[in-house]
Amino acid sequence: DEETFQDVKNILVPIPACLMGLARLDMPSIVITGGVMDAGPDLLTLEQIGMYSAMCQRGEITDEKLTYYKHHACPSCGACSFMGTASTMQIMAEALGLMLPGSALMPATCEDLKEMAYKAGKQVMELVKKGIKVSDIVTEKAFENAIMVHAAISGSTNSLLHIPAMAHE
């Protein structure tokens, strides 16, 4: 409705854009993401495909092995399962206080994600009752917290562009 905002985002650009939009709207808001993709066999991720492509070009692995890696690097729905921009920004949203604790990196295929979405809905209604808006949550202290968390997780450098843009809002 027009009194609350819940949004589901899961790739690198929409998350910062969503957070900036929430800052502009300045209304009771909670973000819930669609979760993180499962890792492939032997913890294979999309991030490794470039390395395997180079290995194939050098003759270190076969075309068949490269094709196998390409077909198994993204075994489920969800954000990339490495510490790229999407995962970093999901963690930043949680560190800023716009996601429920523990929700930033939940697996997309986890049944608990539905429960977290339900809790997010209940929480946003509590924010409405209490009149708590984004500007009440995302304070200078919240940004300091997010920056410390970013350093602790060795987050994506792209987020170092997104965080000041969000603060500007």
Residue ranges and their predicted role:
Residues 1-145:
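Active-site cavity-forming subdomains of large catalytic enzyme subunits
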Residues 103, 160-161:
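Residues at secondary-structure transition points
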Residues 147-149:
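Flexible, glycine-rich loop/tail regions that form catalytic "lids" or insertion modules at the edges
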Residues 161-169:
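Alpha-helical support elements that line or immediately flank enzyme active sites
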